Amino acid sequence: MPLPFVFRTIDLDGNTIRTAVRPGKPHLTPLLVFNGIGANLELVFPFVNALDPDLEVIAFDVPGVGGSSTPSSPYRFPGLAKLAARMLDYLDYGQVSVIGVSWGGALAQQFAHDYPERCKKLILAATAAGAVMVPGKPKVLWRMASPRRYIQPSYGAHIAPDIYGGAFRRDKNLALSFASKVRSSGKLGYYWQLFAGLGWTSIHWLHKIKQPTLVLAGDDDPLIPLVNMRMLAWRIPNSQLHVLDDGHLFLITRAETVAPIIMKFLQEE
């Protein structure tokens, strides 16, 4: 049985950051989770619970999301990567492996680039290289640009099939269940997250990421078309691509399928 999450709220650089750690065993390098835009840390719990119970997992709400405070001014990805490193110091972690989902995948790339000695392995799920990405359909991106789906759960459930694709197209209850777990902190935090990625790209330094990297993609992802994950796998030297028969949120909808792939990657020497 995996141990329950231990929640802590910590003060870092003027921010109140809500963290959750699922304790594990010392023979496995802990895994740090960077979540998607507007997504509170509880949304990754089903995925985390599918992983090996010996794997220690660290999750947190970025500033302006869930239980973390909303800063009065915007931030960028390098600043967030620094905040994550400071959080690891505070929680007494040295080296970790990192998984980044969607928006969090950009932050994961930044962290792996800026703190290579802290990041043992990198997992990028349903994400892209930023400003140079091949975008999804305008209607999908327009809906994504608004925090309404997090503030109004019924609207979130209504548009989920169009923006997440995959299993969300087939199972209406999935969208309702997902929407019920969302904990919104309001519009400003969401807009700060959008601003963090404005004009940002990793394309010119992806070749400098030396960590073993697993790129995970869904073949029916309306937000981040598959070609973007192929580009990441092409640009990152020590990477492998794994494509799943699902949409944008395969970590949640296909947790039992994805977890063994991730554990195999993390345990490879």
Put a short name on every predicted segment.
Residues D220-I224:
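Acidic catalytic loop of the alpha/beta-hydrolase fold
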Residues I209, V215-A217:
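Short beta-strand/loop motif that positions the catalytic acidic residue
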Residues G247-A259:
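Catalytic histidine-centered segment of alpha/beta-hydrolase-like enzymes
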Residues Q109, H113, C119-R149:
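Flexible "cap/lid" loop of the alpha/beta hydrolase fold
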